[in-house]
Every structure is written in C-alpha cells, then in structure tokens.
Amino acid sequence: VNALSGLQKSCQFNILQDHVGLISVAHQAALRLSSFSNMVDMKTTHTSLPFAGHTLHFVEFDPASFREQDLLWLPHYAQLQHAGRKRKTEHLAGRIAAIYALREYGYKCVPAIGELRQPVWPAGVYGSISHCGTTALAVVSRQPIGIDIEEIFSAQTARELTDNIITPAEHKRLADCGLAFPLALTLAFSAKESAFKASEIQTDADFLDYQIISRNKQQVIIHRENEMLAVHWQIKEKIVITLCQHD
C-alpha cells in the first residue's frame, strides 16, 4: 500500500511538472512575481512583530489545506518532489514569510535552496527562516542574522536532551538563572540555533561549541571561539523566539 501510494504521489507530481513545462518561461516568471494568495490554496495568515530593531514576519498555516500544486509557485519546486508533506508545508510557509520580509527591502523574489539546504538570499541582504508547529517565521537584515522559534520543552524532553545541548557548567548557570529548567534549556537550544544561523560561514560546529555565559531579561550572551554573541529573546505564549545578528 505504501509503495502504491508513493507511486501515485510521484505520478501526480510528474503530471504537475509536465504541465509547468508547457508554460513559457516568461509566463512562469510572471506567475512567480504575482501574489501568491492567488496561486496557493494552503490557508495562511500573516502578522508582523517588531523585535530587537527588526520586523519579524509570522505566517500561520493550515497543513490540511495544502495541495501539491501549491509548490508550483516556487521556482525550485522540483527540489521538493521527494519531500514529505510536513516538509513541503513548512517550506512553503517559510518562503511566504520570507517574501513578506524581503518586501521591506524592495525585493520580489523567492529565496532558493542552497547546497546545504539553506535559504539563498539576494545579494546585499541576509535573512533567516524558522518553523514551529504550524507557524513559520522569517526576518531580513543588511547584516548576517539568525532567527529561531521553538515550543517550550516538556520536562521529559528537557531531561532527554540536556547533555546534547549544554555542558555541565552551562547546566549550573541555567539552574541558577531563575527560569524553570525546561524553559531555560529551550532558550539555550534556541539561542545557539540562532547564533549558528547568524554565522556567515556555517561549519560543523556542535551545540557544545557555543557556550552560554550569561542571561538577562532581554539577551543571552554566547561565547564561541574568539567572539561574544548577543542573542535577543522573548517568550510568546508557549514558544521561545531568539534572534542573533552579527554587526
């Protein structure tokens, strides 16, 4: 049954590809620059929030309303052919959020997919995309920037992930920071994720290579090699949002 289902999905996508192949290049370009609201069936809601000198663009999306043809709006739709449904919906919502963020800087393009699966931004700007549940988040800046959004860990998840995220020294700092440990560990994870994304050259650095030095009500200070990184953070309902920018 699974094999047959996979074959049906593959055939469906191939039919969509063949359909697009019949459209002229000029027409495809026009479609991609037009409003995605007229081309994407997946239901989305856009909101924005000022944070740490930037505007965060949130897109809430309904995965149940997603259709395979929604991907045809993306210039790189073929690269998602073998992705799972969850990946496709998150990716689409993230790119929609990125479009809103890029409009602030006068761009009308969709970030492509890089060799490391990272978003490829237009020359002259940097950006970052994150997902959590049915929420996608994007931000754009003139300097390297990283953004992350995470649902606060449960107590069990926090226990299971602790040793993969923080060192014993960091554990002690977090235990003394005044936050419930699941929240503190979620913040540590998210802050390190944003710091990694903000690195212009993303290496194979481990989470433990990013050391949390201190925390206050607005920032987490992270040390990596010879630099200190300030990561802004806030709690929005049951999620943690972090942002790191390299000056």
Regions found by a protein language model. Name each.
Residues 21, 26-247:
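Core catalytic alpha/beta fold that binds nucleotide/phospho-ligands
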